[in-house]
């Protein structure tokens, strides 16, 4: 409950962001609280902040994940300079950081949403690469939001989250998050469905 209140206070203290939301996600053995802050590119120091806190009892390795990103361009072409920092904070306040930078290509965009592709240099203690697909599509009461990371480290990894939302009333959405992960690209995929309650602030 304390983590939920902390994230609500964070959301209330970031009025400059144009889209703020809090999510509660629950799956088998998992319980997450997520805060998301979005802003129009070029209009703020950071365009996107994502904070995910895991308060499930089984998690003894990592408690909080933070992603901060910035998109910038000085031309009309649909290509952005994209940079981000990802931080994993353990329960004993141990920290692992990942730094990414590279071009973000706007594959399609319009009133319904967008599809973007990021091809980035990745540094997590050693130099490597990462490819990320992003998409947000909203039609009526329905919203589909996804991202998929394919990256190298000591081997090839993949992580994808697909969120489906239905707007029940203004500011309240319910839905599901389908998480697909592979620790090594040749191994079997781990599929994890989660129920989601989203509050748009």
Where are these regions (language model features)?
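Generic structural motif
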Residues: 20-24, 81, 144, 174
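Mid-chain, structured segments of secreted extracytoplasmic proteins
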Residues: 56-95
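Outer-membrane beta-barrel transmembrane domain signature
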Residues: 29, 40-44, 58-60, 71-75, ...
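Small side chains
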Residues: 11-12, 83, 102, 175
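Short coil/turn segments at secondary-structure boundaries
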Residues: 2-3, 91
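Sec-dependent N-terminal signal peptides
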Residues: 3-18
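Outer membrane beta-barrel
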Residues: 34, 44-48, 77-82, 95, ...
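Short glycine/proline- and aromatic-enriched beta-strand/turn motifs that initiate or cap beta-hairpins
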Residues: 17-59, 63-65
């Amino acid at each position: 409950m304390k983590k939920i209140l902390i994230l609500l206070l964070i959301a209330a203290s970031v009025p400059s962001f144009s889209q703020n939301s809090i999510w509660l996600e629950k799956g088998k053995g998992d319980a997450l609280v997520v805060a998301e802050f979005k802003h129009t590119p070029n209009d703020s120091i950071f365009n996107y902040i994502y904070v995910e806190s895991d308060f499930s009892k089984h998690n003894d390795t990592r408690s909080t994940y933070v992603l901060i990103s910035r998109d910038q361009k000085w031309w009309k072409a649909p290509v952005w300079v994209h940079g981000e920092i990802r931080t994993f904070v353990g329960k004993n306040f141990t920290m692992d950081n990942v730094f990414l930078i590279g071009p973000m290509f706007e594959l399609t965009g319009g009133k319904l949403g967008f599809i973007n592709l990021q091809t980035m240099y990745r540094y997590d203690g050693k130099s490597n690469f990462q490819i990320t697909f992003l998409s947000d599509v909203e039609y009526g009461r329905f919203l589909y939001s996804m991202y998929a990371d394919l990256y190298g480290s000591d081997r090839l990894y993949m992580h994808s989250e697909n969120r489906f939302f239905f707007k029940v009333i203004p500011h309240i959405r319910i839905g599901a998050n389908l998480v697909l992960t592979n620790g090594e690209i040749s191994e079997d995929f781990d599929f994890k469905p989660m129920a989601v309650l989203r509050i748009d602030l």
